[in-house]
Amino acid sequence: MITRRALLAGAAALPAARAWAQGAPGIAQRLDDAPAAGIKRDLLIQWGDRVAYDAPPFAALAPNLAAAEGQFGWDTRVLAAMASPRVEDGIPRAVLAVGHPTLDPAMAFPDGRDRPEIAGAMQGASLINIQRRGGVWLVTEGGFQMRRLHARTLCRMGGAGGPARGVFGITGGAATPWGSLLLTEGEGAAWARRLPGVEAAQTGHVVELDPFEPQSVPVKRAALGRFGARDVAAALAADGRAVVFMADGRDGGLLWRFVSDGPAAEPNALDQGTLYAARFEAGALRWIALPADADPYGAAVARGANSLGRPVALALDPNGARLCLALREFPRNPAGAVVEILFAARDPAGDTAIVENLMEGRVPPRPRPGREPALVPAWPVAPSSLCLDGQGNLLVGTAQPARDSALPDALYALPLEGRARGEPSLAYITPLGAALGGVAVVPGAATWVAGVAHPGAGMGAQFAAPRSRWPHFRDGEPPRGGVVALSRGG
């Protein structure tokens, strides 16, 4: 069996892990919106803020379809941060991709009554121009790449397919080495049931678009399978073909891979290729090729593909050395885990890989009734979003199913090498009731951007009576999820 040392031998050494976030031995159970020492938090954008240049001001008490289609969506999942084309003024800029997977009517609408058409406008995805001025990252008002994708966005099906309506339930995404953006409709099936007139067969896809051209038509790449992938990551094979990894977040979900027939540089490279499913066995992984005309899941299971748990998030080393995978319901551990997949010969299109546990979640002790909130170990529970920071750390965001957990959701940094490998450092604690909704690294900057998803949520919470009114804490104003920038120097 190939050893980990042999697999990486001869490769350029990865940067040593840097303790960018400050470690913490424990945190109080009810800490709320707290960056670690030395980290500055700035709010970038929030639910209802303008994305389209002509969107009206946010009016939470009067939800409106036309307004919602031009405003930042209700739910938040940071997907990718891409360097903007360089200009001569030297101002750091980036394009931020954010998904809006779901919408809870009780928290989004004043009377708690669902308004499916407006809800369909509040979900989907947003592309945001950001820039750094005066040491602070800001949204660029009227930025060229700013756009909203929602239930009425015109799309097309890949291959010989025709037009398609809408982008639905975006739970994951990734920038590709060939310059496009991939989005996953992980909650697409739920929106197909919720919205009238939506064809179920046109949901649940991986969607590809040009993030730098606001008029580009999103394409649903049917060749990658239709199973509502939870997340996606993209790489180049050693021979230049496109490689796309997909995490199927269903119970018993599999890890998938698509390898294009032709070079990734071809405009429709993702329309022709081979779909694979992973078989895990004794610290190793083997890819199983699937026939093009079969049901992918049935064919995969029949050929021996298996699951380590529920795959929910991916992070890919751009140098091709490793893929990190977050799992829910890891065997014998309900708190989940993160595993590291090391490609043979550093080729993501290779047939085999080594699999190693990087970190397992820990379930915190329950608080005792009537007692003051105690300190509990600052350790990830239910890892749900991943990002490699380029400095030797894996960023891990948590999203626990129960909103009354003893431990708040948070962002952690895990070194990948050295003596501290797999030991988490706490970077940011989300507001009360919120989950950590994805994380990305701004290219060329010592800044992370993280999503704050559904703040104020919890048992019995509603629009008029949330658990928190983050971020402004104004009477009568609902909590508003959004994106924060986390930078050194706070």
Positions of PLM-derived features:
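N-terminal secretory signal peptides and thylakoid transit peptides that target proteins
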Residues: 1-14
